[in-house]
């Protein structure tokens, strides 16, 4: 009996969402459109420079965004991440549980809850400055293996591979998933993340993963090629199921080496790409745990992603639960 659709593991970060201009990014010297790890002092300097700008708080982190969107679609899940007994940590727990995701990891009595300043420019691109804080101290002892074993999927974010203790937690989750018959889904997270740990990601994809999520840039980084088609073929040769997003071009689905394209849904009012990949993964995981074919799961993933880019921040303001057949037609295979 599977009690949860997905057991998610990732960095627990409070997102601080701030709209800004390209000129500010250029002035500060940040690479647009990617995630950069920074210390508290640097992050504080950015917040000071943007004092007076509108700011919004959300519980976040890549895998957390996926879990929240999964619950919005009607899925069930439990999330593992590390926060501190501080204001941000308490906000994080309450916000996750309000969104419908179980979050029961005991908070640390030391350090500070991690934060991610998300700078959104008028073209809807997001640039993330992340101070991991206590989230980087997540260990294998924080995993509730009993909950993992009664989940259909474990879902692990690639960003966790940047720390020794979080890496150890990832490996244990994957190993225990395989033992318990729980399918392993892994997201590559970021092309820079892939480049930092390419050999490890290759090994994980080949030996542990039942399903990988990536975008075209991440796929090219793993395959060491400039061709997204060749990259997808390569990853498909080492993992049974691959979901590769390609921006407004929708997604490519590979099952046992057979590749198909699933068109995207038009976004009428593109505001912010924060969480688009995370929400795509949520839609796919919802579909796969509710009887959808891989192609129809990707269709639902594309729809959820098309809705999130019309919002500021990685949180849907519309409830999608129970609307799958209305939106997709007969979505079940």
Where in this protein do the model-derived segments appear?
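Conserved phosphate-binding/catalytic region of the ribokinase-like
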Residues: 1-13, 19, 26-37, 176-179, ...
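Glycine-rich phosphate/adenosyl-contacting loop at the front of the ribokinase-like
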Residues: 1-80, 91
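Alpha-helix C-terminal capping segments
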Residues: 67-76, 118-121, 287-290
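Hydrophobic beta-strand scaffold residues
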Residues: 77, 103, 184-185, 242
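A glycine-rich helix N-cap at a beta->alpha junction
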Residues: 95-112
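Conserved phosphate-binding/catalytic loop of the ribokinase/pfkB sugar-kinase fold
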Residues: 104-108, 118-164
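Conserved beta-alpha-beta core of the PfkB/ribokinase-like small-molecule kinase fold
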Residues: 153-233, 249-251
